[in-house]
Swiss-Prot record:
Catalytically driven reaction(s): NAD(+) + ATP = ADP + NADP(+) + H(+)
GO annotations of cellular component type: cytoplasm
Gene: nadK
Reported function: Involved in the regulation of the intracellular balance of NAD and NADP, and is a key enzyme in the biosynthesis of NADP. Catalyzes specifically the phosphorylation on 2'-hydroxyl of the adenosine moiety of NAD to yield NADP.
Name of the protein this chain belongs to: NAD kinase
Lineage, opening ranks: Bacteria, Bacillati, Bacillota, Bacilli, Lactobacillales
Subcellular location: Cytoplasm
Protein's organism: Streptococcus pneumoniae serotype 19F (strain G54)
Length: 272
């Protein structure tokens, strides 16, 4: 029995190829009695690349328990995409057979406490990074209320398991499987000499642990959350934890395993 009637939102970038796929997929979904709904969807399909999936995530980050995501790539296979632009019929068929099954990944919760009492709350699917605007950043790192180290360097990034393959990996961090619900704190160009020392390697903390960053100066710091950038002054502290909510993807026969994604992105075919 065909499973139609689901509410679906399509989100695409403005590139001509993505717009062409958007038009074609919209037509196929309508012909198969799916409902296009941009307000209260059951499924969100991003068309483009991983950056577009991040945008879709942030559009619906306050409805994570109600929606599932599908990534449709118009270029090379990405970490969050299961379909290519020439697989529209396959995608529609799998949607018709969808049972509601899902694959879930952890999300990062970030709280920025300002000295005036304001609290800014963000969610990140990949990572959140902090840098000082114009000079060396100095910040105390506290884990579960216990002082760990004083960091000096360009900045720090905290990543999710799925985000461990992004900026974190380029900094020399470890790649974590998303079933490991943990956060990874990675240094950005730390200052290490006879006077100043840091651990010099990534720190991986389990689900229930909390990482706090306490800047020692009250000037401007730049905080990036996935593909968005913010500037704050007079930061009292920043708290990082695994969020209570997860992102859910539609589980289909086309869902690519995590290690296959890693292999495709960084290794490719291995010669025997």
């Amino acid at each position: 029995m065909k499973n139609t009637g689901k509410r679906i939102d399509l989100i695409a970038n403005r590139k001509p190829q993505x717009q062409r796929v958007l038009y074609e997929l919209r037509d196929r979904l309508k012909r198969n009695q799916f409902i296009l709904n941009x307000t209260n969807p059951d499924i969100v399909i991003s068309i483009g690349g991983d950056g577009m999936l991040l945008s879709a995530f942030h559009k619906y980050e306050n409805q994570l328990d109600k929606v599932r995501f599908i990534g449709l790539h118009t270029g090379h296979l990405g970490f969050y995409t299961d379909y290519r632009d020439f697989e529209l019929d396959k995608l529609v068929t799998n949607l018709q057979l969808d049972t509601g099954a899902r694959v879930s990944y952890p999300v990062l919760n970030v709280k920025v406490f300002l000295e005036n009492g304001e609290v800014k709350i963000f969610r990140a699917l990949n990572e959140a990074s902090i840098r000082r605007s114009d000079r060396t950043m100095v910040a105390d790192i506290v884990i579960n209320g216990v002082p760990f180290e004083r960091f000096r360097g360009d900045g720090l990034t905290v990543s999710t398991p799925t985000g461990s393959t992004a900026y974190n990996k380029s900094l020399g961090g470890a790649v974590l499987h998303p079933t490991i619900e943990a956060l990874q704190l990675t240094e950005i160009a730390s200052l290490n000499n006879r006077v100043y020392r840091t651990l010099g390697s990534s720190i991986i903390v389990p689900k229930k642990d909390k990482i706090e960053l306490i800047p020692t100066r009250n000037d401007y710091h730049t905080i990036s959350v996935d593909n968005s950038v913010y500037s704050f002054r007079n930061i009292e502290r920043i708290e990082y934890q695994i969020d209570h909510h997860k992102i859910h993807f539609v589980a289909t026969p086309s869902h690519t395993s995590f290690w296959n994604r890693v292999k495709d992105a960084f290794i490719g075919e291995v010669d025997e």
